[in-house]
Amino acid sequence: MNDLRHLSRDEQKLLADVALLVKDDDQEFNYEMLKVAAPDEASGEFWFRMAEMLSTLPPNQSLDLRMNGGRLTVAVSILSVLLQDNPDIPQLWAQKIIALNYLAHGHQTRAIGLAQQPDKAAEANEEEYLAKALSQNLLSTLKDAIERFPEDAWFIGMRDDAWKHFGPKEAV
């Protein structure tokens, strides 16, 4: 983690708590509560660092695919707000793309797995819908990022990869 000593003590403590929750892969915790626990005057960097931590996989490489209170969805939510005020910061776009990529692939994989079980058809359909919605969000975010940063090879590579997995056949 980057040097965070310039952040307030409250910001540093909350980020340390977030790091432990992610490390321990706590998928029972409602990560939305972190927004409420944040200091009133939390800095933009604090919010970015929190979103960055939440969209980083824990040591066991487990995805938290919960749509309400899950690590990745909270990261996307935070980054979406940050991008409204700071659209010219490529790191914000990249971190949102990383989180959306995990979510889209995770829900797509879950949908495929559930579709193999006849008694799980309804759940498979729900997961397929989520995968399609998330993949469209991913592709749209990549399009917007490339419009802002047309020479950025990372965004172009991510778009090409996402297009392979979530191209027209996956459109909502």
Regions found by a protein language model. Name each.
Residues 18-32, 64-78, 130-137:
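Helix-turn-helix repeat elements of alpha-solenoid scaffolds
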Residues 4-20, 39-63, 88-128, 133, ...:
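Amphipathic alpha-helical repeat scaffolds of TPR domains
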Residues 36-37, 81-82, 118, 145:
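Canonical positions in the second alpha-helix
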Residues 1-2, 169-172:
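Short intrinsically disordered terminal tails
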Residues 31, 69, 76, 93, ...:
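Conserved positions within tetratricopeptide repeat
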Residues 74-81, 85, 89-91:
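Charged low-complexity stretches with an acidic bias
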